[in-house]
From Swiss-Prot:
Glycosylation sites: 50, 106, 331, 709, 872
Parts of the chain on the Cytoplasmic side: 1-9, 400-439, 493-505, 558-682, 741-747
Disordered: annotated segments: 595-627, 650-671
Main localization (coarse): membrane
Membrane topology field: Multi-pass membrane protein
Residue(s) at site: Transition state stabilizer: 303
Acidic residues biased stretches: 610-622
Native source organism of the sequence: Pyricularia oryzae (strain 70-15 / ATCC MYA-4617 / FGSC 8958)
Residues at the active site: 205
Protein name (database record): Vacuolar membrane protease
């Protein structure tokens, strides 16, 4: 019966194909799907969570756009406040909770990510749920800066505002209703946390993490040591552990129902590869808290668009976030040890005294198991593999050499009847070819060829159809994997066919070990110097390659000693030479070993043995020598050696060969000495190399692809995603490389057809669709002095012009497209919007802004929307070399105003809103070179901004300030009347396109001012 694990073509093809399919298919299914509501989820449902209630809440808060600068935002806030009160009352938890309706906090600071000096007036909602170990009463009134309050609390946070162009179901409606459910769960009798929990619903995250900055003024801030931030950067799908500060807090997430995530995402933020941010950045970077970012992350094409609604998410997605949040908060609040208490390693007393964290490494397996361990442990592991691995393999190779079985890296030796010489000093010895180097350089050559194929494909797609990955990422994956597989197989199989080598597997393993060792060196340096843990893939890989290579080296022990093989080879050569030189020598010369082990004895025919025997008997007419010809010359070297064997010895040898076990023959032309070599160990090597690496590489590859495949429209690199998939395809197929030369042609030829089909598709298919729409960024500007208005669409010019071509008000216009000032590698296309002017006050009930039917707004209307009054100026030239002016700014139906100062004038050195708190240094000092933009946010809709600004004045230069005041309008709920240009673009854009905001304000109205 044939060995099912033999190193033969059929078996290798079958097992490698089955294993890859059995792993890759589930990985894709898990990446695309969302876990169902687990039956054991009823434990949470019975104890406090209510999925139906959460889904209804989500529908209520996402009925309309609710940007912070919209009236609907107030409606959502009022609804959330009511729901909090209802939940607390239903659980009879008034005595265990305190609701904070923040209408007083304000912060003046350097806004995160923009370096723009900003004033913001907060209106967050948050609930303190008292823990069993917390102090009684309203202890926060007596809290002092730097004082440890109890054992530290836990923050769970989500923002309830949306962007101006989205309903915010995923960003961040599901996080918001999850916070409501956390309040419901932990206020239910029997669920009181051990340490207190602060449930925060913050406002104005979208314009720049403003709500998190305002929370810095909360009396509860010193109490919070850890946090769970809930976010959404897609539209439904799975929620992923976006990032985490350390191993200890990550352990609180490790036993959730359906864990999903990798430390690779966290390292992407740490290295600055991800340019966007969440409230996590404020909690950790500014306040020093330790925690996690749990977020939805795909599909990004629907992010910040009107398709971020309940239609494009699911109850399963919501349940996954609710269940994961509950488990994580239970674990964080139940930790009463010293993990989150103690002095900080950086000694910063302005931040939470939450102990010394340790870096971690984490990843999930098939979305069901979570692996977590320390980075320092992995560093020690990495060093061990780097040092012990090569030493062990060198030691084993030395033992093989000492055993006389070192065929690898030896091409020949000279053999005599009693000795073998590898140095060739015995000139009388016969040269025995070993073929030791045969096949050594196949792997790097095949890797270069296959790598060139996928790199060329990446460059071709970048040039011909750069956005195809936007909607067809799996076609790109299929093309890259198929191309690399076929290219690599073609070289390896072709080389093996023309020059078979029994050392092929060993040499490929050696190359894999060398490449893995180099990669591990870089990964280890990153672990030690930058605390980057993403190299865990290479740590596992090199460990697996080391073991597989060790097996390959051990296989050499099954070979005969080189000296024995050389003697046998020399004897067979001598016998063969003598048979050709001496007449009828087969009657007196022993047969070769091959002849002895065959069913037909030398000189005996299977058809007529008696007749053959008679023909072989010499008589007086038999010539002494055969006729001259090839092989009939007497081998004088053979005679010189004087080698003779008796007839009895010949017969004994024949009998032994016939009665004993058959000698294993080399595989299809491989080296003659390789017959006894153990080869069935290949399946062990493949299992060491393949499955775990495919799981790790596949999961990371799919996660990264989902994260970056739709970022090109934002101005990110168009080539990087293709090169990433090309590299990951090579990594995924590396476990197959030692065995691919035994794969039959059927799989590679099928994959060649797949590669050809997907390449053609990727080159000619239109890259966008209603399910993966192209995203353009809208902004309308109005000169409030003249009434001139323009629409600016940011994006890729090729597609912008197609979109604008269908916009009625832009027909017949010459469209100007220039490099975007705010988005890298994109353009701003501009057209006149006089036919669709904005009317921000439409429906506001303000009679002074009513327009007669059919009358378009002009300078008289726009001039009343924003006023800037210089209250006074004060010169301090003699003492400080500066001037100060007080400005009063009024804007209609907006909460936000910007002051943009001319570049020709002096920059602003400081500013302060009258009645507000002073500058908050936690976010950074006021820019040393001054500022030319100030941004002001108010809590209500009517109050005036009164601002003191200071600028430097040179000795003889007393020039004043010039600039433009800009009012931002963001409420698109009645866009057909208030923002008809925006409504027009949304309505007439092709089905394959969608519209998002380009800035916090959809409409920017500016007016000149001078001080």
């Amino acid at each position: 019966m044939s060995n099912p694990f033999a190193f033969r073509s059929a078996q290798v093809t079958f097992w490698t194909t089955v294993v890859y399919l059995a792993l890759l298919v589930p990985l894709v299914v898990i990446n695309e799907g969302v876990p169902p509501v687990q039956p054991d989820g009823s434990l949470f449902l019975d104890r406090g969570l209510n999925l139906t209630e959460a889904w209804l809440d989500l529908g209520h808060i996402t009925e309309r756009f609710h940007h912070q600068n919209s009236r609907e935002n107030d409606v959502v806030r009022d609804y959330l406040r009511l729901r909090i009160e209802q939940i607390i009352a239903a659980n009879d938890a008034e005595a265990r909770t305190t609701v904070f309706n923040d209408l007083t906090s304000n912060v003046t600071y350097l806004a995160w990510g923009s370096a723009v000096p900003t004033h913001y007036q907060g209106n967050n909602l948050y609930v303190y749920i008292r823990g069993k170990d917390d102090d009684q009463g309203e202890w926060w009134h007596n809290a002092r800066a730097g004082k440890l309050i109890g054992k530290g609390g836990v923050l769970v946070n989500a923002h309830f505002d949306s962007v101006s162009t989205a309903y915010g179901a995923t960003d961040d409606g599901m996080g918001t209703v999850t916070v409501l459910q956390m309040i419901r769960y932990f206020t239910k009798p029997g669920n009181q946390p051990q340490r207190g929990i602060v449930a925060l619903l913050n406002n104005a995250e979208e314009p720049g993490l403003l709500g998190a900055a305002a929370f810095g003024k909360s009396p509860l801030l010193p109490f919070i040591h850890t946090f769970l931030n809930l976010e959404g950067a897609g539209a439904g799908s799975r929620c992923v552990l976006f990032r985490s500060t350390d191993r200890e807090v990550t352990s609180a997430f490790s036993n959730v129902q359906s864990p999903f995530g990798s430390v690779v995402g966290s390292d992407g933020f740490k290295m600055g590869l991800v340019r966007s941010g969440t409230d996590y950045s404020v909690w950790h970077d500014i306040y020093g808290q330790r925690g996690l970012d749990l977020a939805f992350y795909r599909p990004r094409a629907l992010y910040h668009t009107n398709q971020d609604d309940t239609k494009h998410t699911s109850r399963e997605s919501l349940w996954q976030m609710m269940a994961a949040s509950t488990t994580t908060l239970i674990n964080l609040s139940a930790d009463t040890g010293s993990d989150y208490i103690g002095d900080r390693p950086d000694g910063d007393r302005s931040k939470a005294p939450n102990g010394s964290p340790s870096d971690g490494v984490w990843f999930d397996l098939f979305g069901s198991t979570f692996v977590l361990f320390g980075l320092r442990g992995m560093f020690a592991w990495s060093l061990t593999v780097l040092i012990v691995g090569p030493l062990t393999l060198f030691g084993m190779m030395y033992l093989v050499h000492k055993q006389g079985k070192g065929y690898a890296f030896h091409t020949k030796l000279r053999a005599t009847s009693d000795s073998s010489s590898e140095d060739g000093d015995d000139e009388d010895g016969e040269v025995i070819r070993l073929g030791g180097w045969k096949g050594f350089f196949r792997f790097p050559f095949a890797l270069i060829v296959a790598g060139a194929l996928v790199t060329g494909a990446a460059l071709l797609l970048r040039k011909m159809n750069p956005f195809i990955i936007y909607s067809s990422e799996y076609a790109v994956w299929a093309m890259m994997i198929s191309l690399f597989y076929f290219g690599f197989w073609l070289i390896m199989r072709g080389s093996s066919y023309t020059r078979p080598s029994a050392l092929h597997r060993l040499y490929v393993h050696i190359w894999l070990f060398i490449l893995g060792w180099v990669a591990l060196v870089f990964a280890t340096v990153l672990e030690d110097r930058m605390r980057i843990a993403s190299g865990y893939i290479f740590v596992f890989w090199e460990s697996q390659v080391f073991l597989a290579t060790l097996v390959a080296v051990c296989e050499l022990f099954s070979l005969p000693r080189k000296i024995d093989f050389a003697r046998g080879a020399a004897e067979e050569a001598e016998v063969r030479d003598h048979l050709e030189a001496v007449p009828h020598s087969d009657a007196v010369i022993a047969p070769s070993l091959e002849e002895a082990t065959s069913p037909q004895r030398a000189g005996q025919s299977s058809n007529s043995p008696q007749e053959d025997d008679e023909d072989d008997v010499p008589d007086e007419e038999t010539p002494l020598f055969r006729k001259a010809g090839r092989g009939n010359k007497l081998d004088t070297s053979f005679l010189r050696r004087g080698y003779r064997r008796s007839v009895s010895a010949i017969m004994d040898s024949n009998n032994e060969a016939e009665d004993g076990p058959k000698r294993k023959q080399p595989f299809e032309g491989e080296q003659a000495w390789s017959g006894p070599m153990v080869t069935s160990t290949w399946i062990l090597q493949f299992l060491l190399l393949g499955p775990f690496m495919v799981i790790l590489g596949g999961q990371v590859g799919l996660l990264l692809t989902s994260a970056v495949n739709q970022t090109g429209v934002d101005g990110s690199s168009l080539l990087a995603p293709y090169l990433m998939i090309a590299a990951l395809s090579a990594i995924l197929l590396m476990p197959l490389s030692p065995f691919i030369h035994r794969v039959t042609k059927h799989v590679p030829l099928f994959l060649l057809a797949v590669a050809f089909a997907t390449l053609i598709y990727s080159l000619v298919a239109f890259p966008f669709s209603p399910r993966a729409p192209y995203k353009t960024f809208f902004r309308q500007t109005v000169d409030l002095d003249t009434g001139d208005t323009q629409v600016h669409l940011a994006g890729v010019e090729q597609y912008l012009r197609k979109i604008i071509a269908d916009v009625p008000s832009a027909l017949g216009q010459e469209i100007a497209c220039d490099a975007s000032s705010s988005r890298r590698d994109l353009v701003d296309c501009t057209y006149d919007a006089a036919q669709v002017p904005p009317i921000p006050t439409y429906g506001s009930g303000k009679k002074s802004f009513d327009l007669p039917p059919g009358v378009s707004p002009g300078p008289a209307y726009y001039g009343k929307l924003l006023t800037v009054t210089v209250v006074n100026t004060t010169a301090k030239i003699a003492t400080q070399g500066s001037k100060t002016a007080r400005l009063k700014i009024d804007a209609v139906d907006t909460r936000v105003v910007e002051l943009r100062f001319s570049k020709e004038g002096p920059p602003i050195r400081s500013f302060r809103v009258v009645g507000a708190d002073s500058w908050d240094d936690r976010f950074g000092a006021f820019p040393d070179d001054g500022a030319r933009v100030l941004r002001l946010w108010r809590r209500d809709w009517e109050s005036s901004f009164v601002v003191d600004i200071t600028w430097k004045v040179d000795g003889g230069n007393t020039r004043g300030l010039e600039g433009r005041a800009v009012a931002l309008w963001s409420d698109a709920n009645d866009a057909v009347n208030t923002m008809p240009a925006f409504r027009e673009v949304v309505r007439y854009a092709p089905a394959w396109a969608t519209v998002s905001k380009a800035a916090p304000g959809l409409v920017e109205g500016s007016k000149a001012f001078k001080v």
